[in-house]
Amino acid sequence: MIYLDNAATTKTAPEVVEAMLPYFTEFYGNASTVYDFAANSKAAIAKARQQIADVIGAKKEEIYFTAGGSESDNWALKATFEAYKNKGNHIITTKIEHHAILHTCEYLEKERGAKVTYLDVDENGFIDLDELQKAITPETILISVM
């Protein structure tokens, strides 16, 4: 079988399954609760957060976990817009982004007053860097191009 939908769901690597197995079978407590059974889950998440922060040079408080890419895209765009809206309201993206980006940009346009520029791409999916440069204004607060 040839599987061509890895952008949506990718087979889990065997070493990841092995590392996660204890959390599927023994330590499956809700890490957000206060009872003792959840302590192992909470500790594992805290350790993972610190490890990721160390690898990328961030603070552990800057590491967030979401349910997946769409939620992450949605959260990143909305949070960035809200955090920087006092500096501008312009977002740049492309016409071929994932729907999580496009739908969130549409929401920000309609409901939050964002101005969004949707760049064209060439036959290979690349943007023209000159067009990107021309699209940037003093009001630009976010560029989201995958």
Task: Enumerate the language-model features and the residues they cover.
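Pyridoxal 5′-phosphate
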Residues: M1-M146
